Amino acid sequence: MHCDIYKFPKRSEMYVYIARPDYPNDTDEIKDWLGVLPKDLRQSLGEPKFLMHLDLAETKKLARVNKDDVIEKLQSQGYFVQTPPSDVLLAQAQARMKEGQDKRYD
């Protein structure tokens, strides 16, 4: 299973894997690979930045997620979202909360 991995500046430490089941035979025409994402999710992520192309069959393991879980989601829905570790999510939530409070009392 081949996939492309994207990151999003609005979402630190979040990565989206997009299935490329027909690779390399799918490169003849330009395609919106992120079109498989639900519209609301895609809009909330902001502008994508391509990171890399990955052949999961050649990859023994992934850094923070289970490779089998990634493959299952790629096959069933065409994408996999790797969320940030819980400590990063907590820090982001706290920063947004503080920012909201600061704006409220300015």
From Swiss-Prot:
This is YcgL domain-containing protein PsycPRwf_1721. Signal peptide: none annotated. HAMAP family: UPF0745 (MF_01866). Residues 1-94 form the YcgL domain. Pfam families: YcgL (PF05166). PROSITE patterns: YCGL.
